[in-house]
Amino acid sequence: MKMDAFRFGTTDWSAVEPTGHKGETGMATWRTCFFGDEANPIRVRMVEYSPGYLADHWCKKGHVLLCLEGELETTLDDGRKFVLTPGMSYQVGDNAEAHQSYTRTGAKLFVVD
């Protein structure tokens, strides 16, 4: 990730239009902004997972993810599981380790990729 093509700015996340994304179970609501070079933008999201959300895919994209509320369980394709609670984050590179998200309680996340 290279962050050199945009100026200082602020984001009022409540003013960003939400989009819904169905999981295998539950729903994800994203508020998404893009910054930087149009050819390789940085995507920044505020994501909310409903209780019982399970992603409908194994993700191979890299992220920096911070848990703001709730609890997020991430399973890697080798079977390892990690639980994030508020104030915890994870980092993974593109194509490094496929991962799938689940939350029993619901979760609010800040994600950069």
Predicted feature descriptions by range:
Residues 78-95:
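Short acidic-glycine-tyrosine-enriched beta hairpin
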Residues 89-92, 104-113:
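A short hydrophobic beta-strand segment most commonly corresponding to one strand
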Residues 49, 58-74:
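Short, conserved beta-strand element in jelly-roll/cupin
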Residues 1-43:
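A short, N-terminal "cap"/entry segment at the start of jelly-roll beta-barrel domains
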Residues 45-47, 65, 110:
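Conserved hydrophobic/aromatic positions in well-ordered beta-strands
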Residues 40-59, 93-96:
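Conserved short histidine dyad/triad with adjacent acidic residue
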Residues 56-57, 74-75, 92-93, 97-104:
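Short beta-strand His + acidic residue motifs that chelate non-heme Fe in jelly-roll/DSBH
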